[in-house]
Structures are given as C-alpha cells and as structure tokens.
Amino acid sequence: MNNNIEMIDLSNINQNTNADSNNVEAQKTNPSNPNNISILEMYGENLSRKEYVTNPAIGRDSEIEQAIVILLTPEKSALLVGKAGVGKTAIVEGIGYRMKNGMIPNALKPYELIKVNISSLLGETKVGEGQSENRLQLLVDELKTKKNIILFIDEVHLLVNRNTTNMSIDFANMLKPGLDRGDIKMIGATTYEEYEAYILRDRAFLRRFLKVDLAETDEDQCKKILLGTYPKYEKRTGVKLEYTDYLKEKIFRFIVQMTDEYKRIYEIGNRYPDVALTIVMSAFSLASYENSPVVTMKHFYKAICRTKVVYEDAKIKEIARFKELFKDILAEENVDLNDM
C-alpha cells in the first residue's frame, strides 16, 4: 500500500480534489438528483446522431432553413405548426440529418438535437404530480447545465394543456426562464387545432417562439418524397424495388394522384404525404411477409386495396384505374388480380 502511495503523481492531487469538490457542489445544488439521472438519456432520442439512410425531409428545404434561422436567433425557439400527417417530425429529422452531416451554420455545430417523448415522461408519473414536477425540473436543469442541446418536443401543446395530463402544474412555466435567457433552445410541433386551443392562450409561452407554418406538400413534392424515401424501406425490410426509374415514377405518381383525389374521404387526419407513404411502406411489408426478394405490382395492388377509405366506391374506382394503367406490367408478371 505504501508503494502505491509513493507512485502517486502529486501534480494531479489538486485536479482530483477540485473534481471531487465540483461533484459535491453539483450534488448540493441539485439534491433532488443525487444519482445524476439523465432525463435526456432515459426519454430522449438523439436525432443528430441517428443513422439516416436518406434525407428524411426531401422537398422541405425552405421550412428547414426557416427553423434553423430561428434557432440562430437569440432567445427564440422554433414552433412547427401544420395539419396531422404533413411531416412535422420529418422536418425536425431533416435538421438532425443536416447536423449529422455538418450541413448547418458553424454556430449550431456544437449542438445536439434530442427528441423527448413528453407523453411518456408525463404518462408514467401516475404516483402523483410531485414526481411529474421533479422529472420536468430535472429535464430543465439538465438542459441549462449542458447548454448545447436543442430540445424537440412533439405535441408541445401538452406543456400548456394541463387537462390532458390531469395535473395542476403548468410545465410551460418551468421552461420559460431558460427560454427567456437563451439557456434552452427548443423546437416544438403541434397542429393548428391544438395551437389555437392551447398555445395561443398562453401568450407568455408563445412569445418565446417564432412560428413555421407547414403547408401540405403538393403532388410533385409528394412524389419526390416517395422516390427519396423508398430506399429506407428497402434497408428495413431487405426487399428491393427493382423496376426502372420510369416505372417507379409512374407507380408513385399514381399513388400520389389517388391520395390527392380522394384525400377528403380518407380517414380524418391523414394528409400528404402520410397516406402515400403508408401505401408504399405496406407494399414493402407485404413483400417481406411473403419472403419475396422484390416488391411487385401485386404488392402495390394489395396495399392500395387495404388502404382505409370511408366510401368503398372510391376504392373500387381507383382499383379499376390501377388495373388499366399497369395492365402491361401485370400481364408481364403474370398477376391475376381476380384471385386476390
């Protein structure tokens, strides 16, 4: 033991002592977190380190740039507002994609973009609002301490809608001081309905944000999204889409036009590009289920047939159009749609 003492580098003693003092001081300043629990690690997903197969926000450069400019604005955070299914989360992932690939301004390069599931964070706290308040306070303290985190909260209206969480705590008030000082940078996302019902009523919370309106993508944008997204489904399922570029574009255009023409009779809440992406994803899943190495017209046909619509007549019309438009390739693949 004495030998070990003689081998100690005395030059490190002061450093070690200082480190120990800092740890003690940290525990003194935050007695509610003696075990140094990281809420960001427990409930967060790091979107700036995520492995992206493709750019998740194709055709949304303008909205992404708007959000980034807001994040560069002192003491302001970004609020994405749009209908359900327009791709709010995809836009935030698009920012994460840019961060991962160094495609952002230098001022944001030290930052990490972390998505926190606020519903899980609050939903699990059934023992009482004291535990909820403690978790939120730990999150706020962690954000203030690290200072290089951009927090993304989907359904950000939950922070001000206390009726949803059945709590009497105003969680938004816990964030306001940090947002005011610029200690906390944030991206929130919500729908127009929730924005008008809850966010607009809390003017003090709202003034910390600048709004980015997300319009529904048009037909051309949606087709580009499908063309840019299908490689992700190839990787996930191990199934390939091996048609020519011309035929791929023709298939995706049909799907986009179908969802455009009948989007008003699809189940409420589905919008571009949500329905179209679901159909393409379903085609890949069906091929994987059948252990097929490739996606065929049969799989697209089945996916279209299984799409939920309110009026069955609309689906019948679209199926007839599909059969006519792709009759040559259906014949080439020897697909008998009458057997399905």
PLM-predicted stretches and their roles:
Residues 2-340:
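AAA+ P-loop NTPase nucleotide-binding core of proteostasis motors
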